[in-house]
Amino acid sequence: TICYNHLTRTSETTEICPDSWYFCYKISLADGNDVRIKRGCTFTCPELRPTGIYVYCCRRDKCNQ
């Protein structure tokens, strides 16, 4: 699987996920008055943390844009 792995305000970059890491994720986190978005590969879909706004998890190449 190929996933985007850039942060909110950086240029788009991708990574090839390690074997058995089938999911791409996109998570938004509240940071004071700002919202940060984090992307990457994962073995299982991440859970929403108290500072999180949403989590998106998918299994297709570059699906976490």
Swiss-Prot record:
GO molecular function, one term: toxin activity
Keyword Secreted recorded: yes
Keywords: Disulfide bond, G-protein coupled acetylcholine receptor impairing toxin, G-protein coupled receptor impairing toxin, Neurotoxin, Postsynaptic neurotoxin, Secreted, Toxin
Tissue: Expressed by the venom gland.
SS bonds (residue pairs): C3-C24, C17-C41, C45-C57, C58-C63
SUPFAM superfamilies: Snake toxin-like
UniProt entry tagged with the keyword Disulfide bond: yes
One GO CC term on file: extracellular region
Superkingdom classification of source: Eukaryota
Assigned protein family: Belongs to the three-finger toxin family. Short-chain subfamily. Orphan group VIII (haditoxin) sub-subfamily.
Assembly with partners or alone: Homodimer; non-covalently linked.
Name the record gives this protein: Muscarinic toxin-like protein 3
